[in-house]
Design a protein with these regions (language model features):
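N-terminal secretory signal peptides that target proteins for export/translocation
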Residues: 1-6
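FAD-dinucleotide binding site
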Residues: 8-17, 24-594
């Protein structure tokens, strides 16, 4: 159950990609292929998934929770290393958030989830996709902008590009700023522990950073005396969070006034799936993007093909992982599966909802990471068209739109306190003619996506055919935007209304959102989430992977999911080799003593 909706192909974009063949990534992951075992994967059939009561037919080396990209890549690597695996998947299909719907009369495969391979030259999935026979199509990023419902002219586009460049440069410098703030916090902490008077420490901090910008520091220095631990934790977090708010780096020059809403939406909700003020600058700065390609049959189809032949128990939502003994027991309904290790690859959203109980409870730092990381939201409205309403635009074109809302949508937006431009306008993203087909895909991100999706709560439980009872506003806004963008006054005649499909990832019980988001000051929690957990005997038994655990350059993405699965597989194998060697050594010592 992995990878999310779609980080869009803007300058700091998102997708889900992975790592199998890329030497640039391989070089950074320790090679665990030495000392491979000769163990053969036990025979697998559906009976392995349907046994009632205590399941004891096989004790697998690894039970993998989730058949998304991370789980599948881990399973393939573990089998390659000679380890036996069983994958438990809550859904009736594999792929997680890599999932294709078939749109319009031509049944065009369009991804409900992530659609792009970002940073094609360095993306580890590029070669794998090509080798498996899929055809890539380049996305046109010289995007048209629509301001107040009209297409921006060349000069306005230049202004936007200039502002975007300034923002990206500033965010890149943010990582350095955060490190400076961390060093400042460590210095203050050291002095406090050395009994330097609090007033003196605070005076030094005030000289460097005005407390007006960091209210927590003001409270810390003027409130009750704290223990050294409290003082250090609060100071470090306050400084780190303040310098890591992505919205701080939006250029404020007057020449950018008209395009700032587009920039904020493009860098925030339409990319990170969260409002820019809730987004980590460091997380965004480190993400690697570049040239962006779609896949002819969809990434969902690619991931499904990648998982062919793997032992997967579908319709098996895991409810408990017990790692208290010599191995693990993983419960799915009334079935209990046994293994030496467990690899959990579910989304941050599933972990936050506590859908899986862990016995014993996870360490506090792991729980803190789960609590701190968030799930972003991205809704797609996929509209099949009867004809090409954008004859002057290239295929696979990415567009930004800002325009007035229909009356009923405006009333709703104000009631829900959703972000508006000048009190009446919304900002959306669009992909025009994906895969060179007469289709338009509208994107709502962040608060807009979450609020629109929640209108379908109790009516829908995932993505698919539009529901007129609850998707009406999403469709009305998209229809209005398409009319303004194309100049088609009779837009309804161009739309195949019965074929519209809508994504609702926040309502999907296998994800509870599009993809993970690191809020300001919490980018490092991804690394904590990825840490393995030891059982009572001191041996690592419980492992984690998925886009939420990815390195900063792949945060929340397909390559992050894929790489994390591969890395976890190698970590598991290395741990087992060490354990097996100790057992052999103990056996040798025992025979010698005899």
């Amino acid at each position: 159950v992995i990878s999310p909706n779609t980080r869009l192909p803007s300058a700091i974009a998102l997708c889900f990609a992975g790592i199998l063949l890329a030497t640039s990534i391989h070089a950074q992951i320790p090679d665990a292929h030495q000392g491979e075992t000769t163990f053969t994967q036990p025979p697998f059939d559906d009976a392995d998934c349907t046994s009632n009561g205590q399941y004891r037919a096989h004790r697998y080396d690894v039970i993998i929770v989730g058949a998304g990209l991370a789980g599948l890549s881990a399973a393939k690597e573990l089998q390659h290393l000679g380890r036996s695996v069983l994958i438990l998947e809550a859904n009736n299909r594999i792929g997680g958030r890599a999932y294709v719907g078939f749109i319009g009369d031509n049944k065009v495969p369009i991804d409900y989830g992530g659609a792009w391979i970002h940073g094609v030259p360095t993306n580890p999935l590029t070669g794998l996709v090509d080798s498996m026979g899929f055809i890539r199509q380049r996305t046109e990023l010289n995007l048209p902008y629509f301001i107040n419902g009209r297409q921006a002219g060349n000069e306005e586009k230049k202004v936007f590009d200039h502002a975007l460049e300034e923002y990206e440069d500033a965010v890149t410098l943010a990582a350095r700023s955060v490190e400076n703030q961390r060093a400042l916090a460590e210095h203050a902490c050291s002095e406090y522990k050395s009994h330097v008077p609090r007033k003196e420490i605070c005076r030094d901090l005030q000289r460097r950073i005005p407390f007006s910008k960091i209210s927590v520091l003001s409270d810390l220095c003027q409130g009750p005396v704290r223990s050294p631990g409290q003082f250090c934790r609060t100071t470090e977090k306050a400084l780190r969070v303040t310098s890591d708010v992505a919205e701080r780096y939006v250029p404020q020059s007057g020449e950018f006034k008209d395009i700032i809403p587009l920039l904020i939406a493009n860098a925030g909700p339409l990319e990170s799936a969260a409002e820019l003020r809730k987004t980590s600058a460091v997380d965004g700065a480190h993400f690697e993007a570049g040239e962006d390609d779609l896949i002819d049959k969809g990434i969902g189809t690619f991931v499904e093909k990648l998982g062919e032949g793997l032992p997967v128990c579908r319709n098996s939502p895991v409810t408990e992982v017990n790692y208290s003994g010599d191995g693990v027991k993983v419960s799915a309904g009334d079935k209990v599966f046994e293994g030496a290790n467990a690899l959990v690859t579910v989304s941050v959203g599933v972990l936050k909802k506590k859908k899986i109980a862990f016995r014993p409870e996870l360490p506090k730092r792991k729980l803190q990471a789960i609590d701190t990381l968030q799930m972003g939201n991205m809704q797609k409205v996929i509209v099949p068209l009867n004809r090409d309403i954008f004859p002057n635009e290239p295929k696979n074109a990415w567009a930004l739109y800002e325009g007035d809302l229909p009356a009923e949508a405006l009333t709703f937006a104000k009631k829900q306190h959703l972000p508006l431009v000048n009190g009446t306008r919304v900002v959306m993203g669009f992909v025009i003619k994906p895969l060179n087909q007469n289709i338009a895909i509208g994107f709502f991100g962040g608060d807009w996506a979450r609020t629109l999706e929640q209108r379908c709560d109790n009516l829908e439980h995932g993505s698919g055919k539009s529901n007129p009872k609850c998707d009406d506003l999403s469709i009305a806004i998209t229809r209005s935007a398409l009319s303004n963008m194309s100049g088609e006054k009779e837009i309804d005649e161009a739309i195949q209304a019965d074929g519209i499909q809508v994504t609702r990832w926040s309502l999907d019980a296998t994800s509870f959102g599009a993809y993970s988001v690191a809020e300001p000051g919490s980018w490092h929690e991804r690394e904590v989430l990825a840490e393995p957990v030891k059982g009572p005997n001191g041996i690592k038994r419980l492992f984690f992977a998925g886009e939420g655990t990815a390195r900063e350059i792949y945060n929340g993405s397909y390559p992050g999911a894929y790489e994390s699965g591969l890395k976890a597989a190698r970590d598991i194998h290395a741990t087992m080799l060490e354990t097996e060697e100790k057992a052999r050594e103990a056996g040798r010592l025992g025979s010698t003593e005899k």
